[in-house]
Amino acid sequence: PKELLIVGASRREHTKESWLSHLGDYPEEFCHWLDFVSCDLDNQESLMHLHDESADTTYFLSVPPERYENAIINLKEAGFLDDPDHTRVVIEKPFGYDLESANHLQSVVGRYLREKQVYRIDHYLGKDTVNNILATRFGNILLEPLWNREYISEVQIFATETLGCDGRAQYYDTAGVVRDMLQNHMLQVLS
């Protein structure tokens, strides 16, 4: 689209240039769509740097799960989520750490947003390899009739990680690898 703006926001003090260098190498024609503002989801005043009333806006909450509630409340109370036809919120898993916390977060979402404003996602399912499973299963006329319980006796899923917990230690301390990888990623791939 011609009128697209992707704004990174963080409590960390960055300039647009320092933020772009932190992201890595991207083509200039992509980078001109990027901007950066420093703000704090816990401080409504600092959120005012985010607002653009003329645009359809999606807020991707790339924050620790325990901050989702406060982020939603402050974005709503600052007036950013008032137009359900033009504002969205993306919440990445985990959506709570157990049934009680998931129900609580759902009550917050229901109180401050309309359901059509909310996207709950798992970034892992967007990976090329995972998407290729479906393409291979349903898009290959040779394999499609054979890919069923009559011809497949066993399914093995290997999740090999090349990265450690770098930058994710706090998340893993609260979520744990079983919650992060097994119950979300691996079971969704299996299904």
Language-model region placement:
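Secretory/organelle targeting and membrane-embedding segments
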Residues: 1-90, 95-191
